[in-house]
Amino acid sequence: MFYGGAMALMQDDIKRVFAYSSISQMGYLLFGIGSISTLGLAGAEMMYVSHALGKGLLFMTAGVLIVQVGTRSLSKLGGLGSKLPITAVCAVIGALTIMGVPPTSGFMGEWMLFYGVLETALEEGNDVRSLMFALGLVATVLTMSYLLWMLKRVFFGKLPENFSKVKEANWYMLSPMMVLAGFTIVLGIYPDIFLQKIMPYMQGVSGG
């Protein structure tokens, strides 16, 4: 979680930011699985789905930037929210999903995952698990840092003069992004759509 997050903060290539972010997010899955609790396992499964939705949105955002702007270098970007409004909204939803902010599916997944880890730590009275829980919270702050930093550099600030003629992507590129954005919000508001299917299996795995 920490290595991927720290490396993401140091990248200029937006695709590399998302690639290192994926490494960090896989750490969350192992974090939840390691709790061996029903909620922790279910949270890890939900995080897996949320990561697919959120990171899919972010990589599609990178694709729009490459096609419409011609670069994926963060140091050359800025102020594109006014030129790519739909892309910007979808990118924000994708980032919120990865950060675990409501009303996206990432919130419920992350909440269940951390609750499961804390539950196991309290039941066992294990200081190591309690420390891991605290470190997980710190890693979440790191996740928020590199994603907010990315959004600021791409969509906010001053628009470079050479981007004055940039236009929003066509609907062939935007439609899939809007579908994924819709899925993550619907799943965030109605998590039982997913949880009712997987909870019995997670209870069987955890022995709960």
Predicted features along the sequence, with ranges:
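Cytoplasmic/organellar membrane-interface segments at the starts of transmembrane helices
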Residues: 81-87, 144-208
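Hydrophobic transmembrane alpha-helices and their helix-loop junctions in integral membrane proteins
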Residues: 1-152
